[in-house]
Amino acid sequence: MERQADKLSVTASAVIWFGAAVSVAEILTGMLFAPLGWRMGLLAVAIGHMIGGMLFYLAGLIGAQTGRSAMETVQLSFGRRGSLLFSAANVVQLVGWTAIMIFTGAQAAAALTAGWSGAQTVWGVIIGALILLWLRIGMRNFSKINLVSMGTLFALTLWLSVQVASGEPAAAGQADAEAMSFGLAVELAAVMPLSWLPLVSDYTRRAGKARAATLSATLAYFCTSSWMYAIGLAAALFAGQSEIAPMLQYAGLGAAGILVVVLSTVSTTFLDAYSAGVSFHSISSRFGEVVVASAVTLLGTLLALVFDVSRFEGFLYFIGSVFAPMIAVQIADYFVLKRKPASGEVDWVSLALWLAGFVFYRLMLKWQPPLGTTLPVIAATFALTLLVRKLLPSVGKAAVREG
């Protein structure tokens, strides 16, 4: 039984997810919305985050109510071995996110210290080392340190917002990004909270108050992530900036800009690395969570130093195609059908339902529906799961292979 001191408070939950949402990657993604203009761009951000935020809350609530990690909640629907597919996919996406976050953070910090020789490499190593230090501190002490660092980050981000948004609207003409449909923009907003679905229960499982802590995490992430997208959009439209470093310089944030970049990168990437350890532990318990998280940090740092990973839209769509249908099956099973945990090693019906959703997602990307891809995929997979489980129960029972 977990000690009360180890429980995550409502405030601590919000602070963690505020830190997760303040990231260079989210600002960069917001910059891509510039072709839509200010009003339509913000509308796409809001709709996408509402879709992703709803799924974020439901995924986190399953973990909070059951006390299970994210990948352990996946086992409830897909079976012990069936969940390994998603554990492996999650580790892969987290290694990818670690590399992307360290790369973009180091690139921005390097541009602010352009006089340094090999500045990007140096900052990449510094950020990687700080993430390792955060991992050594551990989750119990992390929330205490994070409260101080996030307070600093909040103040700096407020200043950044005011400076970026104070530009002349006429500068919007300088933003000359590739044309983007409204539906594609909604999807790019939805997949950012969607990327946290395989992680959120790793933290909400420790919640002292399941619903309240999960709601505070969801609202903190929803509001802050939307804010980051809006900063990126405003930077592109009103300040004529399409990269992080010039934007920070435009806002008059020299050394403070470096602090924003480093703090936001470390606080977000810590969660990626830690959850990679938790996910890998569900595949093999041979290595501890912190050991694996440290290895992921080192690998991500190496990838960030060797490869250019500055464009990652395709990576976001991959995440959406894997995890959107996964959570649709889980939501139907847990909240509506109230199914007992899968008794076999692999629940083939659940995997078939997921595969149908995966294929549908990839097809929908080509069609670009007006409200994005995630919403119709979730609705279709959810409805199909209810249909198969309620109207064809014999199919579900026969397809489960007992361990």
Summary of predicted features, one role per range:
Residues 1-40, 181-186, 198, 205-215, ...:
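Membrane-interface "cap" regions at the ends of multi-pass membrane proteins
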Residues 16-21, 86-91, 102, 113-137, ...:
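Transmembrane alpha-helical segments of multi-pass small-molecule transport proteins
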Residues 31-61, 82-84, 221-223, 380:
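Extracellular loop-to-transmembrane helix junctions
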Residues 46-78, 85-93, 389-394:
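Juxtamembrane transmembrane-helix boundary signature
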Residues 122-127, 131-164, 176-177, 214-221, ...:
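Membrane-interface loop-to-helix entry segments
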Residues 135, 151-177, 182-185, 189-194, ...:
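Hydrophobic alpha-helical segments and their helix-loop junctions in multi-pass secondary transporters
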